[in-house]
Regions:
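Non-membrane alpha-helical secondary structure
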Residues: 8-15, 30-31, 95, 99, ...
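Non-catalytic terminal regions of proteins
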Residues: 112, 116-322
Length: 322
């Protein structure tokens, strides 16, 4: 997800503010007008984003966001309290718990049948339904001032710059920890994401992600779990896609107090250390030490595949909230 783009963050901040004003509007015309401004900001933002990132945002609003909306209804809470200064560049996941219910509340105002449309699968996202339902005659007459736009732009520039600086510092601190380092290189058999905590992870840019609580991976060669310690993953896909969903090519743990316990039984290798376990088939274990002692886990190269064979793919992802 492109978190470090100041223009995208500017659009997201203006969209959130427009939603705040729509929810606060006492009458239908004001709500329709500011909801329209929010959807305009969203369309412009989504047009500049990778399709996978757009789908990620819509999917989470439709699932996590609607779950929050239903919880608000059950507890008789009023409209969601969206932050006046918007959401930060690295709080995309957090934002869906406010923006999703906000879109649902506005749909309640403009389309009494929207829940039926969602249940029937005729809408891909809450924002798409709202865009269709807004009355054109009531959607004009409000806009952000030039000063408001410039203020949002300046703040987004500062926030994304801080994000990039913080990422570099966190990555450097991870690799600077004294102690043993464990590196697992999956090679041509990427490790599939089976469990993770989306609220306790940090995208470092490119295909690197720093996991701060939970990570579960597996492939046709075994399984591994990291719990209550940090681990850094490098995704198998270095393009514009999600850095985890194509699988993990390399996993690194740093700052281990001692070498992991490694036991073998036939072709199976079991690796254990504080906060980490792995059971792997056919793995090779190599220890090197040039300043930092590194335990490297690899596999022998695959034999040449037969003609027409399909390369291995990583299993599908699951989060700890599934």
């Amino acid at each position: 997800y492109p978190m470090d783009d100041p223009d995208l963050l500017t659009g997201r901040r203006l969209e959130t503010e427009a939603l705040r004003r729509a929810l606060a509007a006492p009458g239908r015309p004001g709500a329709a007008c500011w909801a329209s401004r929010a959807m305009e900001q969203r369309r412009a933002r989504f047009a500049r984003m990778p399709a996978g990132s757009v789908g990620y945002e819509r999917w989470n609003e439709l699932n996590e966001g609607l779950a929050s909306y239903l919880e608000d209804l059950a507890q008789e809470r009023h409209a969601p309290d969206l932050p006046a200064d918007g959401y930060g560049p690295d709080t995309v996941r957090t934002a869906v718990y406010g923006v999703g219910p906000a879109l649902a509340d506005l749909l309640d105002r403009f389309d009494s049948a929207w829940k039926t449309k969602i249940d029937s699968g005729t809408a891909a996202g809450l924002d798409q339904l709202l865009t269709v339902d807004l009355p054109l005659a009531e959607s004009a007459g409000c806009s952000f001032t030039a000063e408001e736009k410039e203020r949002a732009r300046a703040q987004a520039g500062e926030d994304t710059a801080k994000l990039v600086t913080g990422r570099k510092a966190d990555r450097a601190a991870f690799f600077a920890r004294p102690g043993v380092r464990l590196v697992i290189e999956a090679g041509s058999h990427p490790l599939g994401l089976q469990g993770f905590d989306p609220l306790n992870m940090e995208a470092l840019g490119g295909s690197e992600v720093l996991h701060k609580r939970l990570l579960q991976l597996s492939n046709d060669r075994g399984t591994l779990e990291v719990f209550n310690r940090e681990a850094l993953t490098e995704g198998a896909d270095a393009g514009d896609h999600h850095p985890l969903f194509a699988g993990v090519r390399t996993l690194t743990l740093s700052g281990l107090a001692a070498e992991p316990k490694v036991t073998r039984e036939g072709e199976t290798v079991k690796i254990e250390t504080e906060g980490f376990t792995a059971t792997l088939k056919g793995a090779l274990v190599e220890t090197t030490g040039n300043g930092v002692r590194i335990i490297r886990i690899t596999w022998p190269p695959d034999p040449p595949p037969p003609a027409g064979a399909t390369p291995p793919t990583a299993p599908g992802p699951h989060s700890s909230t599934d």
